[in-house]
Structure formats: C-alpha cells, structure tokens
C-alpha cells in the first residue's frame, strides 16, 4: 500500500468530527444500511435483536467503536504505514460471530454512505478514498487476526 498522506489523515479526522455531531442518528443510518444489504447480519449483533434503535446505547457504542477504529487506522497508516489492532481479540470475536469476507464489503459500503450523509456537500472522491483506504487496511488487519484465531 502506498503512503497515507497527511491530507488523507486530516480528511478522515475532520469528517469524524462531523459524525460525532449526531452519533445516534449516524449510528442508526449505519446499521440500517448494513441490514438492508445483509438482513442476516442482524443475528451477529445482539443489540439489533429488536431492530435498529438510535436510542440503544449499545448500538451507538458499537458504531462509534467501528468508526473510531477506522480513524485510528488512518492515524496509524500515516504514522507507520500499517495498521496494528489495539484489541488482539478482534479476530476471534469476528470468527465466533461468523463474519465472512463479504461482510467486510457490506460494512465498508455502509460506512462510506454514512459518512457521505454526515458531511453532506463536503463529500468528495478524495474524502471517500481516504476513508476507503483506512477501512480496507483495518479490515485486512482483522482478517489476518481471524486467520490466526
């Protein structure tokens, strides 16, 4: 992978700030998009047993965790050119939940669409690409950890 630029890191961080302005709403959008593409994914998340509820603190917390890990990936890519998982159990958790390769694509699409909505007219290809690279590298690190789980 090529170098992750300072500008890419800045784009990810600034759009993360936009997301944080309305976490419950954006979290609900994120999981709604996931379930539209992969309805069976509802069974992978205990907090979705009653559907997508923006007032559910577990839904909000998990969405924030996914997005924050992607932001952290951008920071790591800029600083050292690779992503190292802060939580070594992520691989085994994903294996236990039955996560397969196509699920990562569904999550990526939902993440990008959620951020597109969060930033509105500030969205552009450069911003989308920065998030895409950060997420792809995070997903690769999780998949690697899944292989050794």
UniProtKB/Swiss-Prot annotation:
Subcellular location(s) of the protein: Cytoplasm, Cytosol; Nucleus
Positions of heme b binding: 46, 65, 94, 97
Keyword Iron: yes
Domain Globin: start-end pairs: 3-147
Any GO molecular function: oxygen binding
Record-listed O2 binding positions: 62
Modified residues (Nitrated tyrosine): 31, 135
Its job: Leghemoglobin that reversibly binds oxygen O(2) through a pentacoordinated heme iron. In root nodules, facilitates the diffusion of oxygen to the bacteroids while preventing the bacterial nitrogenase from being inactivated by buffering dioxygen, nitric oxide and carbon monoxide, and promoting the formation of reactive oxygen species (ROS, e.g. H(2)O(2)). This role is essential for symbiotic nitrogen fixation (SNF).
UniProt family annotation: Belongs to the plant globin family.
The protein, known as: Leghemoglobin
Species per Swiss-Prot/TrEMBL record: Canavalia lineata (Beach bean)
Lineage: Eukaryota, Viridiplantae, Streptophyta, Embryophyta, Tracheophyta
């Amino acid at each position: 992978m090529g170098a992750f630029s300072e500008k890419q890191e800045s784009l990810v961080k600034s759009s993360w700030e936009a997301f944080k302005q309305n976490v419950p709403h954006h979290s609900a959008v994120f999981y709604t998009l996931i379930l539209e593409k992969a309805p069976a994914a509802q069974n992978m998340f205990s907090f979705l047993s009653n559907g997508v509820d923006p007032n559910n603190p577990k839904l909000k917390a998990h969405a924030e965790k996914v997005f924050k890990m992607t932001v952290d990936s951008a920071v790591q890519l800029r600083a050292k050119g690779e992503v190292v998982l802060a939580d070594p159990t992520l691989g085994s958790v994903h294996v236990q939940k039955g996560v397969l390769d196509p699920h990562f694509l569904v999550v990526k699409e939902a993440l990008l669409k959620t951020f597109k909505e969060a930033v509105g007219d500030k969205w552009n290809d450069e911003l989308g690409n920065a998030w895409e690279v950060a997420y792809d590298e995070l997903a690769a690190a999780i998949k690697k950890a899944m292989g050794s789980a």
